[in-house]
């Protein structure tokens, strides 16, 4: 940070109000976003300059707890923004918002650091190539396909399966992916972060020595955590720290990087907390007035260039299941594909609880996925929509009052609904069912055959929690044999 030869710019704490610390500088004021450091017992606390108040006082946001800080203690201006370690040394490590290791394995030993605030790549550098990313999850690959170098949002309320879905995507994509991945845990449960680390170790995504201890050499993922118990400053910046590490692999090493964020809503929530602490007048629903700007600055950096790509998967919590809430609504415009998780579908016991009519992708076009895939997806949505429209009639009058054609549609829709469920690898310990990875060709063929009525005679339960259609047929035969 500051070089030994340069005279240090030193200030003193004049006020501490929770995570907000005011610092008085007698000489030179540090610019906005500069990192300051102060000692708190044995630890070094990083403060980021947020406002110039006048009278030589700067208002800063702490990246760590301020318990123990006192008025009058020294604060050192580092002369630069918060910088985090980048490069291969970060792989296999767990770091906090300022890039310090929290996995008790000693210093990172990185040869290079980069500031967490940066501009998005210029238009001339950006790439517009489209290639489909296979996830192995039927409902996603068929109805809302993801693209390499694209941005994906997993929207859902509390407890409908966002984290399980993001972990399955990590399992299916990151494990088979040759390049590197970065996972940013933003304001989520520490337990989930710990579970994910151990899953990566078991799967070999984080390499280990003969004693089972994690090592950087051979590891494929860097983890950056700023979890629920951290102050708002850390939660508002940890996504940027993770993104900076991903940008290094994209720009300096020309890699195709996977960037997972759980949860983007907590980034916005922390921004709202910081905004209130800084005394800004809130906008709609109490969010910060800079909501769209903050989101844009983060999202515009997550992009593909001619050197490499960043494919990002972001879990986005939806407060009170309201997709029109300003926080989830602010991220819609930035995404290439949206996967919406529905409480109504999860209550039916269908997992992943993806809403096939609400989820969308700009990649679902004949020129990208092909005519057969496109037509099958649209036919599936049409059948499900007709079923939805008929549900009121069924509830009031019963199935007997429907026409023959409508009864066929309802039967196929119910089979499709169940067939959109799928056992996950990461949920094997809970469900007792082995996880399934289904190739896109099998998915398209299976749904086309259901639409064409080839399996109208199979019981609906045969389609529940299976992989390809061949497994559904085998399950139906087994059910028939057991019933006989």
Curated annotation (Swiss-Prot):
Its EC number is 7.1.2.2. It is a peripheral membrane protein. It comes from the Bacteria. One of its GO terms (molecular function) is ATP hydrolysis activity. The keyword Isomerase does not apply. GO terms for cellular component: plasma membrane; proton-transporting ATP synthase complex. Produces ATP from ADP in the presence of a proton gradient across the membrane. The catalytic sites are hosted primarily by the beta subunits. This is ATP synthase subunit beta. The gene is atpD.
